Every structure is written in C-alpha cells, then in structure tokens.
Amino acid sequence: MVEVVRNKRPPRGLVPRLRRALAALMEELGVGDKGVTVILTGDRRLRALKREWWGEDEATDVLSFPHYEPGDPFVPPHLGDIWISLDTARRQAEARGASLEEEVLVLAAHGLWHLLGHDHQKEEDWEGFRRVQERILAL
C-alpha cells in the first residue's frame, strides 16, 4: 500500500499516478505486500530533517526513513517513509527537461531503493538506483 501525504500541493493527477507506479514497482521488487508513506513537502521541511538527522544544513530532493534495519530477518508491514521536496523536484525537472510528475516518480523510486537497504556511496552502487528510477517511469 502506498499512502501519500500532501504537505504541499502537487500538480493535478500526480498523486494517483505516484500511488499506482510505486505500488507496481514494489510488486516487481517483491515487496508488494508491504506499505510505504510518501510525504510531498517543500525545501524548508527537507532542510530541517536533513539538519536534524544528518547534521547537514541544506535542502535536498528526497530522504528515506526506514522503519526497520535493512538486513533484519523480520521486515515489518510498513517499510518506512519517503520525504520528497516538490521545490527541489521542480528545479531538477526543469534542469533535466522533464515534467515534475516524472521527477517525483524518479525520486520515489530512489527513496524506495534506500528503504530496501541500498546506498550509493560508490559509483558501482548507482546501477540499482538507475534501474528502478528508469523502471518506475514505464509503469
């Protein structure tokens, strides 16, 4: 199940597509029976969260907060929360020549991949992120 919380108004049609595409991606990744919450908000909130949890005083596009430790034998019914800044997503979409809807889908897939225990500390770690980010756009 994909729950979407709107702290900032998204474009019309984004929320239903986000729910459908993220749920389909979760199914493909074998976690279709789990839940996630996506919070659509702005730069100010993401900056505050990043400062509180990472000690970095800057806005960002997406943050993931898992509700379990990846690698634990028990994966709870709710994987965690994905926070997306619509402000940063809009700027990134414009820079890439993409729509805001596409950028939010890419960020949601990126956040989900983090919730599943993946990181991108090294260049070779990015392959999985690229794969899920491309896949969600096709769903």
Swiss-Prot record:
InterPro entries: MetalPrtase_cat_dom_sf_prd, YbeY. Zn(2+) binds at residues 110, 114, 120. Pfam families: YbeY (PF02130). Its main location: cytoplasm. GO terms for biological process: rRNA processing. The gene is ybeY. Its EC number is 3.1.-.-. This is Endoribonuclease YbeY. Binds 1 zinc ion. One of its GO terms (cellular component) is cytoplasm. Keywords: Cytoplasm, Endonuclease, Hydrolase, Metal-binding, Nuclease, Ribosome biogenesis, rRNA processing, Zinc. GO terms for molecular function: metalloendopeptidase activity; RNA endonuclease activity; zinc ion binding.
